[in-house]
Regions:
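Short cytosolic juxtamembrane segments of multi-pass membrane proteins
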Residues: 241-247
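Transmembrane-helix boundary motif in ABC transporter permease subunits
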Residues: 64-94
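Hydrophobic alpha-helical transmembrane segments of polytopic membrane proteins
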Residues: 202-241
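Generic hydrophobic transmembrane alpha-helix motif, especially the helices
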Residues: 95-131, 138-139
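Transmembrane alpha-helices
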Residues: 122, 126, 158-191
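N-terminal signal-anchor/first transmembrane alpha helix
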Residues: 1-22
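Periplasmic/extracellular loop-to-transmembrane helix junction in inner-membrane transport proteins
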Residues: 24-70, 208-211
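Short cytoplasmic-facing helical segments at TM-TM junctions of multi-pass membrane proteins
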Residues: 135, 139-174
Length: 247
């Protein structure tokens, strides 16, 4: 409860500071609308089917990207973490690809995939892969050898050890990787919508608000909603980890 109260106090302090800056003569009124204006516009936008369509498009594409990233990264991490030969053979390629920012791949993705949702989903998958993959590998590195030896004593084969011993032990690490990947994928998703000419999504909403009549209140509405989605994802996955895989 104390942590929750402190969190509320931190949010309240941030909003008060924002309100003061927004109404201060130090900044032009149109450059930083105060939260009282932004949240009023947020209420208006939440009644707009068009805005809801943008939010749903981003959230749906984000969920698809996370599911695809999990489907690729977890099996790959299990293989790389349990088969040293494969890990050594792929290390150079992985270390080359991992530092490349997803946004740097936008031109290539547009040429290959066009301007549809496939582009933002693919780039979000690329960004989300790495935290899940490396957390899975790390989890297998930390696997207690005693658990493996005990399973083998009872006649469990290599695949059985992998799926019934290694994977359950790795789940807390994997879920932490998914939590990190979800917020990273959200950042990439909105960035691609903003930069790659998407026709729907929060990034597109922000771009339209900024490039049209310069409605900074709408720009900040899109930004706030993206932040709220990130907080809900992060807190939801953390609660799942604590409740179901806290071992």
């Amino acid at each position: 409860m104390r942590a929750f109260t402190r969190g509320l106090l931190g949010i309240a302090g941030f909003l008060v500071l924002w309100e003061l800056l927004g109404r201060s003569p130090l900044l032009p009124a149109e450059s930083l609308p105060p939260p009282s204006v932004v949240f009023g516009e947020l209420v208006t936008q939440l009644t707009s089917p068009d805005f809801i369509r943008h939010v749903v498009a981003t959230v749906l594409a984000l969920l698809i990207a996370i599911v695809i990233a999990i489907a690729i990264a977890v099996p790959s991490g299990l293989v790389l973490g349990s088969v040293p030969a494969v890990r050594h053979a792929t290390r150079a390629v992985i270390e080359f690809l991992r530092p490349i920012p997803s946004v740097a791949l936008i031109p290539l993705a547009l040429v290959m995939l066009g301007f549809g949702p496939e582009t933002k989903i693919t780039l979000a998958v690329y960004a989300a892969l790495w935290p899940i993959l490396f957390n899975t590998i790390y989890a297998l590195d930390e696997l207690d050898p005693l658990l493996v030896d005990t399973a083998r004593v009872f006649g469990t084969g290599r695949l059985g050890v992998l799926f019934f011993v290694a994977l359950p032990s790795a789940l807390p690490f994997v879920l932490t990787g998914i939590r990190l990947a979800a917020t990273t994928a959200l950042v990439v998703m909105v960035s691609v919508e903003l930069m790659a000419g998407s026709q729907v999504g929060l990034g597109y909403f922000i771009m339209e608000a900024r490039s049209g009549p310069g409605r900074m209140d709408q720009v900040l509405v899109g930004t706030v909603v993206a932040g709220v989605i990130g907080v809900l994802l992060n807190n939801g996955l953390e609660r799942v980890r604590r409740r179901w895989v806290a071992w």
